[in-house]
Design a protein with these regions (language model features):
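Extended, charge-biased low-complexity segments
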Residues: 1-55
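Amphipathic protein-protein interaction modules
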Residues: 39-100
Length: 103
């Protein structure tokens, strides 16, 4: 899966009391990009207490934490209301920027 697919399909992942969904992705030349390789991890609340870097090292070496799905879904919903972000490319770009610099 690539990062843009994970972002645009964010509504397909529903967190529960037992499972929390997170995206981990690989950087290309030091940056997250729409075509960066991405993984969706399902973690238990106990696993969420671990440092994210340790989760990445043990469950997906070479990948870095990107965002939790509940954060992504809230931000995605907000973007749907803004005319400037109607295209998928604009939504993906803004979410990547948010994950890199604002989250």
């Amino acid at each position: 899966m690539i990062l843009s697919e994970a972002i645009l399909n964010c509504k397909n992942y529903i967190d529960t009391e037992e499972i929390i969904h997170l995206i981990f992705a690989k950087r290309n030349n030091g940056k997250f990009l729409p075509d960066s390789e991405a993984l969706v991890l399902e973690l238990t609340p106990e696993e969420m207490e671990m440092q994210l870097s340790i989760i990445a090292e043990t469950k997906c070496p070479g990948f870095e934490y990107f965002l939790e799905f509940f954060v992504l879904q809230d931000f995605y919903d907000d973007l749907l209301k803004i005319e400037e972000f109607k295209s998928d490319d604009k939504k993906v770009g803004r979410i990547i920027y948010y994950a890199e610099f604002d989250a």
